[in-house]
Amino acid sequence: MLFLGQKALLLVLAISIPSDWLPLGVSGQRGDDVPETFTDDPNLVNDPSTDDTALADITPSTDDLAGDKNATAECRDEKFACTRLYSVHRPVRQCVHQSCFTSLRRMYIINNEICSRLVCKEHEAMKDELCRQMAGLPPRRLRRSNYFRLPPCENMNLQRPDGL
């Protein structure tokens, strides 16, 4: 019976606490503001970013230079932001007077990363040709200056009724 009294006291206490007293949202749930990185993808590795000066001393072998002579001339390293939002459950301890309890709260962690990919000229040309085919345009070698132009490929999916 004593256990029922504690539940009733906790219920009355939860109802009587004003809603603005409870910290809602992401800010204010933890005391430390340490940015954490989480990933569920096993292919991604959260290594610390390397500095360009640290990589300046590393020279590729002659085999790598011979094989990549044409690739480096037509390819470039493109950097892009790959920001992810992760949802995690964190234990949060709340104390009211002398009684404390721990609850699991959902927190959202933003993982800001800069990713890079190798973009080659021939891949861009293939993508451009595929985009032209999807838009109903002729291949680039048969293009005439007075041919009707459609919007770019990225916008075509938005204009189709089934593209949503």
From Swiss-Prot:
Pfam family, one: MAGP
Positions annotated with a glycan in the UniProt record: N70
Source organism superkingdom: Eukaryota
The keyword Metal-binding belongs to this UniProt entry's keyword annotation: no
Residues spanning the signal sequence: 1-28
Residues spanned by motif Cell attachment site: 30-32
GO-annotated cellular components: collagen-containing extracellular matrix; extracellular matrix; extracellular region; microfibril
Protein name in UniProt: Microfibrillar-associated protein 5
